[in-house]
Curated annotation (Swiss-Prot):
NCBIfam families: rpsB_bact. One of its GO terms (biological process) is translation. GO terms for molecular function: structural constituent of ribosome. Residues 239-257 have a biased composition (Low complexity). Keywords: Ribonucleoprotein, Ribosomal protein. This is Small ribosomal subunit protein uS2. It comes from the Bacteria. Pfam families: Ribosomal_S2.
């Protein structure tokens, strides 16, 4: 089963080679840094391409064996792409604040998910027996639970692999995955440590276009793996009532920048970092 291919050209067009300012680097990323330009580290994409290919192969094979993929990215510019990619591939996601114990205390989390589903049933049914205040309180509780747990409501247990955007911001999620022996695929910018990451992918983790590229590629790998799993079970994929749609091609996510969009990638990435701070 062929995983999607992300080329060096795709990565360059998305600005994936631009790291942080040199004074903000993490020395443990030195093996993945090509050099510096205008005070900004340049990541070595000749390593990124094969490392990402290896990670995508692992995700595809995990999904093909029936495994669950958890997408994690809570920073502002990652929230949309993370949710879109997980939904498109029939997988799971966390794109708001990571709750402590979300994996290591799964029993408590699963009880909260049950509460979410109960509230949804109550609010979608006849609420005439409730006061306006009771309806309002239940609605607020449901919305809060949906924001935190909606992306994992159907996961049914801990995932088999975790994909992370921004290893610094998602440090707690990675620690929980490490405790449970869950392999982590992570996009690593020049300011993070690769420790605890089974599948490191050195690349910019701030530029919105680059994040979309990574998420689409992982979604495509998970989709192909899931299709293989269903085929192995003898399911007729063509007869599915609502077949899982394969995400847009990776090449489309990294389409050339138009003249109207043309902004130096360094400036764009730095602007997004500052606004997310």
């Amino acid at each position: 089963m062929a995983a999607p291919v992300v080329t060096m050209q795709n990565l360059i067009e998305a600005g994936a080679h631009f790291g942080h300012q040199t004074h903000r680097w993490n020395p443990r990323m030195k093996p993945y840094i090509f050099g510096a330009r205008n005070g900004i580290h340049i990541l070595d994409l000749s390593q990124t391409v094969p490392l990402f290919a290896r990670a995508l192969d692992f995700i595809a094979s995990t999904a093909a064996s029936g495994g669950k993929v958890l997408f994690v990215g809570t920073k502002r510019q990652a929230q949309g792409p993370i949710a879109d990619a997980a939904r498109a591939s029939g997988q799971h996601f966390v794109n708001h604040r990571w709750l402590g114990g979300m994996l290591t205390n799964w029993k408590t989390i699963s009880n909260s998910i049950k509460r979410l589903k109960t509230l949804e049933e109550q609010l979608s049914g006849d609420t005439s027996g409730l006061t306006k205040k009771e309806v309002l309180n239940k609605t607020r509780e449901r919305d809060k639970l949906e924001m935190s747990l909606g992306g994992i409501r159907d996961m049914g247990g801990i995932p088999d692999v975790m994909f992370v955007i921004d290893a610094n911001k998602e440090e707690l999620a990675i620690k929980e995955a490490n405790v449970l022996g869950i392999p982590v695929v992570a996009i690593l910018d020049s300011n993070v440590s690769p420790d605890g990451i089974a599948f490191p992918v050195p690349a910019n983790d701030d530029a919105a276009r680059a994040i979309r590229l990574y998420c689409d590629a992982v979604a495509q790998a998970a989709t192909r793996g899931g299709q293989q799993a269903r085929a192995d079970r003898g399911e007729d994929l063509g007869a599915a009532v609502e077949p899982v749609a394969e995400p847009a091609l990776v090449e489309e996510a990294a389409a050339p920048v138009t003249e109207d969009e043309q902004v130096p990638a360094e400036a764009a990435a730095e602007t997004e970092r500052q606004s997310d701070a």
